[in-house]
Amino acid sequence: PQPEIIELIQDKRKQKQFYTSNNIPTAKYILTNSKQEVVDNKHFLPAVNKLGTEGYDGRGVQILRTVDDLDKAFDKQGLLEKLIDFDTEIAVIVARTVTGEIVTYPAVELVFHPEHNLVEYLFSPANVSAEVAKKAEKIAIEVIEKLGMIGILAVEMFVDKKGDVLVNEVAPRPHNSGHQTIEGNITSQYEQHLRAVLGWPLGKTQQILPAAMVNILGHEGYTGIARYEGMDEILREEGVHVHLYGKKITKPYRKMGHVTLVAQEPEILKNKVNFVKKTLKVKA
């Protein structure tokens, strides 16, 4: 993406201000500069304390539900974001060319690790109503247009209990929430990104089959040279595709790769996802 867009997006404070200044729906928030300022705003709890910069893969995020959690607050520039009572988390991948052509991919449903704030697995398409899917698509298009961005943009969103869709954050690149497009959609997010930045016509985004993605994470309690258990077993499964990142050293919850899966039926797909999660382990 363009340098000015990287500058905006790499700071979550600037991101949130961009959303509010452009009337893009997002959770209420307060900018903070220190741990004391977080404590001073305890009336805003329950909330999520996010670092302005340096956060990635779940790092730089603390959930503060009550005053007893305030010790976990960051003593750096960041923000307090109102904790959303959401039904599900979704993402829409959107692409835009220099000529303004835009396409979106079907919304995907994200399932996060309960403790480490990073995506554990996802399903595509998301199990949401047509109305919610349409809202999410419209918001993703609005975000990439307002940014004036060229390339692929992943827009992560909450769907609350009322069916409202709120932007959480965005990533200006091929993203974890689009890996399944390699096997699951007519055009992968990687090919689409190249088409967008080269000014070529954008590819079709329709879903070929129900698809899923499971992140391969370092197993808890193991640090050292990575050793994969269960690889042979999962590779025998039809529709299972392993993508490793070539990282030699594993650490607890480090992203070591991902598995993309396709199946004819959503129920079969869920069973395959559970099998991969249970079988494939990264130890040392």
Regions picked out by a protein language model, each given a short descriptive name:
Residues R96-E101, D160-G163, A263-E265:
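Short acidic-glycine loop/turn motifs at beta-strand connectors
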Residues R195-A284:
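Peripheral (often C-terminal) accessory segments that flank ATP-dependent C-N-forming ligase machineries
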Residues H43-F44, D160-L166, Y253-K255:
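A short, glycine/Asx- and small/polar-enriched loop/turn
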